[in-house]
Amino acid sequence: MAGTKPGDLGQVKVGQYVVIDGIACRVMDTAHSKPGKHGGAKVRMVAVGIFEPVKKEYVGPAGSRIDIPLIDKRKGQVLALMGDQVQIMDMESFETLEIPMPEDVEGIESGAEVEYFEAMDRYKITRVIGK
């Protein structure tokens, strides 16, 4: 599963995922403001990229649409550690994937079970489940 779906900007909450400038991001802060008597409400959003640690800001009308990435969370088993890459076998489809080694997840070793997700044709290991 990959790609995006449209969502309502005014309904986005902290912790959800959005696409800003083609980058899948996790929303860290939102603020709604109504500028005046005849103006429409605006939403200011601060988000951090899922795959790159880049901070993004977005401001738009509360009634507008924003892309929401389709995220597929899965479990896999680590087959091999190859430098800055990790080879994983998906536990459902048994396909093998090469995913970049995450800097913020500890305990990744051969044979460990991990949780990873796919968003917009990219993969990331989120945590180690067991060994």
UniProtKB/Swiss-Prot annotation:
InterPro entries: IF5A-like, IF5A-like_N, NA-bd_OB-fold, Rib_uL2_dom2, Trans_elong_IF5A_hypusine_site, Transl_elong_IF5A_arc, Transl_elong_IF5A_C, Translation_prot_SH3-like_sf. One of its GO terms (cellular component) is cytoplasm. One of its GO terms (molecular function) is RNA binding. The modification Hypusine is found at K37. Transmembrane segments: none annotated. It is found in: Cytoplasm. Keywords: Cytoplasm, Hypusine, Initiation factor, Protein biosynthesis. GO terms for biological process: positive regulation of translational elongation; positive regulation of translational termination. Pfam families: IF5A-like_N (PF21485). Functions by promoting the formation of the first peptide bond. Belongs to the eIF-5A family. NCBIfam families: eIF_5A, PRK03999.1. This is Translation initiation factor 5A. The lineage of its organism: Archaea, Methanobacteriati, Methanobacteriota, Methanomada group, Methanococci.
